[in-house]
């Protein structure tokens, strides 16, 4: 079926001597793998439009099974700052990898196309990339099959008491029921607050995110435990982010920016 589609380029892979496989998350049809003949040849006409960290509108032959094909590019947005900054690159790669793992190929992803678009645009603007990644991680728990209860206590339904996260109970426990799980995460009220807020945050409406460093570090710890113990997903791009803190030095602020 030859049709217009909107897509986010998730990754590229060399194929044979002169060709390439490119996976897109499409707004209409979910994840699709495209065969790009001659993409590695010098002078390939769509080379600039099929760079990493691009999104746009395309015309292609989309197949229900097997590889699809791109005929032409109608418009494209290049996330330039992500491509130039190793930290932004790392967080963008991580959230795209999570999306790739969370959803099967060839199935529409609904609101997640816009949520990933917004996440990448915020990261490209250097708007709290680590926290944007946290939002994606928290909201992807449901597609991963974990779906913790973050609205109220899983035992009694109360939300007016201090809350903590329990992996055993699949979500929050209020203070009256903390004794039920001695291995609860012992999270601070601030970390639980942002865990709950981020679970419903629409990134399209976000212009800035500010969280104290101590709370951000605790949120990172909580999500690492949940992903390790409940989700079971450990990506190379996440390990790179974990290691990056020991050697990465941010670039100087870009000129003409606040």
Swiss-Prot record:
Keywords, alphabetical: DNA damage, DNA recombination, DNA repair
Example of a GO cellular component annotation carried by this entry: bacterial nucleoid
Source superkingdom: Bacteria
A Pfam family that the UniProt record links to this protein: RecO_N
Gene3D superfamilies per the UniProt record, alphabetical: Nucleic acid-binding proteins, Recombination protein O, C-terminal domain, Recombination protein O, zinc-binding domain
InterPro entries for the chain: ARFGAP/RecO, DNA_rep/recomb_RecO_N, NA-bd_OB-fold, RecO, RecO_C
One GO biological process term: double-strand break repair
Function: Involved in DNA repair and RecF pathway recombination.
HAMAP family, per database record: RecO (MF_00201)
Family note: Belongs to the RecO family.
Record PANTHER family: DNA REPAIR PROTEIN RECO (PTHR33991:SF1)
Name this protein carries in UniProt: DNA repair protein RecO
UniProt source species: Lactiplantibacillus plantarum (strain ATCC BAA-793 / NCIMB 8826 / WCFS1) (Lactobacillus plantarum)
């Amino acid at each position: 079926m030859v049709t217009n589609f909107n897509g986010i380029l998730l990754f590229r892979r060399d194929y044979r001597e002169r060709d390439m496989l490119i996976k897109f998350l499409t707004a209409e049809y979910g994840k699709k793998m495209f065969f790009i003949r001659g993409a590695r040849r010098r002078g390939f006409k769509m080379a600039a439009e099929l760079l990493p960290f691009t999104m746009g509108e395309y015309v292609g032959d989309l197949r229900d099974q097997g590889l699809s094909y791109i005929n032409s590019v109608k418009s494209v947005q290049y996330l330039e700052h992500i491509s130039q900054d190793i930290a932004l690159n790392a967080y963008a790669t991580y959230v795209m990898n999570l999306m790739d793992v969370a959803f099967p190929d060839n199935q529409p992803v609904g609101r997640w196309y816009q949520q990933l678009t917004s996440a990448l645009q915020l990261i490209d603007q250097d708007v709290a990339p680590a926290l944007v990644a946290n939002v994606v991680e928290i909201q992807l728990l449901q597609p991963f099959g974990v779906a913790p209860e973050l609205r109220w206590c899983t035992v009694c339904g109360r939300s007016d008491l201090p809350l903590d996260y329990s992996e055993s109970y699949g979500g929050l426990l209020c203070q009256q029921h903390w004794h039920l799980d001695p291995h609860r995460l012992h999270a601070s009220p601030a970390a639980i607050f942002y865990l709950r807020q981020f679970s419903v945050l629409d990134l399209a409406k976000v212009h800035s995110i500010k969280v104290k460093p101590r709370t951000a570090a605790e949120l990172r710890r909580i999500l690492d435990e949940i992903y390790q113990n409940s989700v079971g997903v450990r990506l190379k791009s996440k390990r790179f982010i974990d290691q990056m803190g020991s050697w990465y030095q941010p670039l100087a602020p870009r000129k003409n920016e606040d």
